Amino acid sequence: MELTPREKDKLLLFTAALVAERRLARGLKLNYPESVALISAFIMEGARDGKSVASLMEEGRHVLTRKQVMEGVPEMIPDIQVEATFPDGSKLVTVHNPII
């Protein structure tokens, strides 16, 4: 199977998000890369489901809370930008202050 660099990036991100979900389910607090991966995967899957950019920008702020991440992580992530594939093409989704 041949994958483009973009497809490899998406696969790596999705794998990191799965690890983050499992750690969260075990009650562990997420670190920076796990937090970014989980929120980014949520946005990518929402786009695939046909949600709007505006709804993903809002919903992306409620994926994680401060109690679910390690100390200092929310301050390290002022914004998350994800280029997601929607039914009508690729769009950039920006989530400001994603961990509240």
Swiss-Prot record:
UniProt KW Hydrolase keyword: yes
InterPro entries (alphabetical): Urease_gamma (IPR012010), Urease_gamma/gamma-beta_su (IPR002026), Urease_gamma_sf (IPR036463), Urease_subunit (IPR050069)
Pfam family, one: Urease_gamma
Enzyme class: hydrolase
Record localization: Cytoplasm
Cysteine pairings via disulfide bonds: none
Keywords: Cytoplasm, Hydrolase
Span of the signal peptide: none
Pathway(s) per entry: Nitrogen metabolism; urea degradation; CO(2) and NH(3) from urea (urease route): step 1/1
Record field: catalytic activity: urea + 2 H2O + H(+) = hydrogencarbonate + 2 NH4(+)
Coiled-coil regions listed in the entry: none
One of the record's GO cellular component terms: cytoplasm
Enzyme Commission identifier(s): 3.5.1.5
Biological process per Gene Ontology, one example term: urea catabolic process
Origin: domain of life: Bacteria
Chief place where the protein resides: cytoplasm
Residue intervals passing through the bilayer: none
Keyword Plastid: no
GO molecular function: nickel cation binding; urease activity
Family label: Belongs to the urease gamma subunit family.
The protein's assembly and partners: Heterotrimer of UreA (gamma), UreB (beta) and UreC (alpha) subunits. Three heterotrimers associate to form the active enzyme.
Official protein name in the record: Urease subunit gamma
Organism annotation: Klebsiella pneumoniae
